[in-house]
Every structure is written in structure tokens, then in C-alpha cells.
Amino acid sequence: PPRNMDDMSLSELPVPYLENRPDVALIDVGRQLFVDDFLIEENWLEKRFHQAVLDETPVLAPETPMEWNKGVAPVAAPFTDGCWYDPADGVYRLYYHAGWFDGTALAVSADGRHFTRKMLDNQVGTNRIFVPKPGWQRDGSCVWLDQETEHPEERYKMFHYFRTPEGDVAQVAVSADGMHFGDPVTTGLCGDNTSFFYNPFRKKW
């Protein structure tokens, strides 16, 4: 990313690939998801957006003491955390916000629809994957399964944004199994819903 950005600016960020459009955009690098007209020269199709249908049974609902949070704003929601299918063990892993500004927890599934909470030893009796320091409240979070890493101990990468008594802090950590993460490292300045991803075509984060 550019290093000369104004950290305090509220204006929209520039979009380089829109400001400097190439004459020809190569799309033979892999599968493409067409969400706009950027890569389309001409077409004869009519866009039609349909109303989403809400399933009567949610994938997750508050059940555990951590999620119920003593009745204050119960939460069991994926938020920005992430859901991954891990081919190593054939399991879907759903990372989610458990309890208002509290935990990051793990639920697993064989089909991607029916999830059960994976009890872990990070905090006995819970499915918490990361125990924050006392007084720290989690905000945005993101977990990424890196299937191209050359370091098995870094297959899972996690970002957390915390509200702390001393000020906001963002941290990253890595894990081999997606359940036990190493000591986190503090990042530079960023926002509460900061995210990250890996582009397998360009081989860049």
C-alpha cells in the first residue's frame, strides 16, 4: 500500500486500478468473480438482483455463558472473523465473535451448515481460541487459512483489534492448527475493521 497516505484523512481511498485502467486486462490467471463491469468489454445481459431469503434456523445463536455475556447484548456471530474449509482434516472452521466485545471462538462442521462448538484448552470449558489480556475488548477480527505457506506452523493467520484502557491496539498471530495461536505481534496503525487476504494469482498479501 502507499506509504504517503494521510492517516487522519476521512476522504475515500484512491483505487489505482480504476484510475489507471489498462487497455487490456488479462483474465487467464485463474477463475474470476464478476461483481461489476470492470473486466467486461461488452455484454447483452440484464443485471437482476434478488432479495435474500433468511433461513429460519441460524447457523449460530448464543448458547454458552461467554456468548450470553450475563444477558448484556448476547452475541454469537461470524462478524468479520472468517469461515474456512481445511482440507487437512476435512472440516469447516467458523471463527466468530462470542459475547459482546469479548471472545473469539471456534465452531466446526462437516457440511458447512451444522456447526458444533469445539471445546479447547486455551480457557477450560470454552471454545475460545485466544484469551485477551484483562480489560482488553476485542473488536474486529480476521482469520485466514494460508494453504501456500512454506511454514506449517503459520498455516493460520489471525488479526485482532482491541479496545484497551491504554488505547486501541491491533495484533497478529499465527497457528499450525487454527486452535492454538502463538504470542501476538503488534501492528502499525489501522482501523477497527481492518482485514487482510492473500491473492493466490498475484502471490501477494
Description of each model-found segment:
Residues 1-205:
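Carbohydrate-active catalytic/glycan-binding domains of CAZyme proteins
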